[in-house]
C-alpha cells in the first residue's frame, strides 16, 4: 500500500474541527473515511477533493502534493512521448493535438 502526504489533519485541527464534522461538511458517510484520507491510505474522489478545497481554501496541490506531482509527471511524460510519435502528415486535428501537448508543461502546478 502506498501512503500519500496529506495536510488534511493539520487543516482540520487548525480550524478546530472533528473528523465527524469534516465528514459531514464534505459529504462522506463516516469519520473513518476522513481518518483514511488524513493518513494517506485512500485518495479522495473528485467530489471530495473539491469539497476539501472549498472547506479549507486550499488547492489540491497544497492538500495532496504527492498525488498532484505524480499526476503531472505522468501527463508530461506521456505528452512528450506522443509528441515524439512519427506522423506522416499533419492534419488540422493533429496540429491542434500537438498544440495542446506542447502547452502541458506550462500548465503544471509549481509547488
What are these regions (language model features)?
Residues 8, 19, 31, 46-49:
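Helix-turn-helix DNA-binding elements, focusing on the entry/boundary residues of the two helices
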Residues 27-44:
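Recognition helix of helix-turn-helix/homeodomain-like DNA-binding domains
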Residues 47-62:
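DNA major-groove recognition helix of helix-turn-helix/homeodomain DNA-binding modules
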Amino acid at each position: 500500500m502506498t501512503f500519500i502526504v496529506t495536510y488534511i489533519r493539520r487543516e482540520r485541527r487548525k480550524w478546530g474541527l472533528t473528523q465527524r464534522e469534516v465528514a459531514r461538511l464534505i459529504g462522506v458517510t463516516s469519520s473513518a473515511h476522513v481518518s483514511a484520507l488524513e493518513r494517506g491510505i485512500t485518495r479522495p474522489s473528485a467530489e471530495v477533493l473539491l469539497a476539501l478545497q472549498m472547506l479549507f481554501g486550499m488547492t489540491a496541490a497544497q492538500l495532496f502534493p504527492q498525488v498532484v506531482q505524480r499526476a503531472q509527471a505522468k501527463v508530461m511524460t506521456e505528452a512528450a512521448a506522443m509528441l515524439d510519435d512519427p506522423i506522416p502528415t499533419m492534419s488540422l486535428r493533429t496540429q491542434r493535438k500537438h498544440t495542446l501537448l506542447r502547452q502541458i508543461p506550462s500548465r503544471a502546478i509549481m509547488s
